[in-house]
Regions:
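Extended beta-strand/beta-hairpin segments
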Residues: 12, 161-166
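Beta-strand/loop substructures that line and gate deep hydrophobic ligand-binding cavities in soluble
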Residues: 87-147, 154, 165
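Glycine-rich portal/gate segments that line the openings of hydrophobic small-molecule binding cavities
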Residues: 37, 47-94, 104-108, 143-162, ...
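Hydrophobic ligand-binding cavity/cleft-lining segments
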Residues: 1-51, 173-176
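Short hydrophobic/aromatic-rich motifs at helix boundaries and adjacent loops
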Residues: 7, 17, 40-42, 67-70, ...
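Generic structural detector for well-ordered beta-strands
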Residues: 16-20, 71, 98
Length: 176
């Protein structure tokens, strides 16, 4: 089971988009196994290991070859879920997906990411973590979250599968 790092300060990044759909329709999409294959612009392959609500585990291989495992830890039926993502036993980040009804057939989909720099930047001297995090990682992760949610928005509203880099390239996860 993947664990959060101990004694690690997390940094939050979040993005929200309005989607022309009910929370039930959004939930059906975000809670189906291997959904990233249809909706994620940087996902080369999303493979389910097991799909059992808060015990779900899957793998994501990004377009640039990076492979991460997702361990779901909380499941809020019809509302969202929480997961840990990383390469091995220690998570690189904690992720919260949340659906909120706004108006008739308009809902908000949010993804909140808590990044653990001691894990993702461990190959760099600690003195550089602040600069790398604030000038590279956080801006790239903001773009990443926007692209991911736009992918789900497109799939939910039109039924059209998202293509590679559909909303722009992100060098942390894809190749041009």
């Amino acid at each position: 089971m993947m664990q959060k790092p101990t004694n690690s300060k997390g940094y939050n990044v979040e993005h929200t988009e309005y989607i022309e759909a009910s929370p039930e329709v959004i939930w059906k999409t975000i809670s189906m196994p291997e959904n990233l294959n249809r909706c994620h612009p940087f996902c080369k392959k999303n493979t389910m290991i097991k799909w059992e609500k808060e015990k779900s585990i899957d793998l994501i291989e990004y377009e640039n070859g990076l492979k991460l495992k997702r361990h779901f830890t909380k499941w809020f039926e019809g509302k969202g879920y929480e997961l840990l993502i990383g390469k091995s036993g220690t998570a690189s980040a904690q992720v919260l997906w949340d659906i909120e009804s706004k108006y008739d057939q308009i809902s908000a989909l949010s993804i909140q990411l808590e990044i653990y720099p001691e894990v993702i930047l461990k190959k760099y001297p600690k003195i550089f973590h602040f600069f790398i995090l604030n000038w590279y990682v956080i801006p790239k992760m903001k773009d990443y979250l926007q692209s991911v949610i736009l992918g789900f928005k497109q799939y939910i509203e039109s039924g059209k599968t998202v293509s590679k880099n559909e909303f722009g390239v992100n060098l942390m996860f894809s190749n041009p």
